[in-house]
């Protein structure tokens, strides 16, 4: 899956407080060849709020993973279904394995 490919490139930053709600939602737009046209953090305003430094670090690491994984291996059919995606990067889910 596309999510599994990107998560395989994601290095979760060390030292984050994983008891917090550290869910980063990212909207992706893809070309038919799997290249990312645009990646946008949906809770972008949260990155600049006081006390949200951990969230910002995690969000930046998720965007980095998307860049590193390009081009994604995408299905040869159904472009209309997967050209725009929303991915949820949840550090707690990743740490559970």
Question: What are the residue ranges of the model-derived segments?
Answer:
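Conserved "boundary/linchpin" sites in short secondary-structure elements
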Residues: 4-11, 27-48, 63-97
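Short secondary-structure boundary micro-motifs
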Residues: 10-13, 55-56
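Short loop/turn motifs at secondary-structure junctions and domain boundaries
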Residues: 16-21
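A short, polar/charged loop-to-alpha-helix boundary motif
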Residues: 47-57
């Amino acid at each position: 899956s596309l999510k599994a490919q990107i998560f395989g490139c994601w290095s979760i930053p060390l030292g984050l407080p994983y008891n917090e709600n550290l869910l980063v939602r990212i909207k992706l737009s893809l070309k038919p060849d799997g290249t990312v046209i645009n990646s946008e953090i949906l809770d972008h305003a949260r990155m600049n709020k006081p006390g949200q430094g951990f969230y910002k670090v995690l969000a930046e690491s998720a965007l980095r993973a998307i860049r590193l994984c390009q081009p994604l291996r995408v299905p040869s059919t159904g472009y209309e279904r997967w050209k725009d995606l929303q991915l949820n990067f949840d550090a707690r889910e990743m740490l559970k394995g």
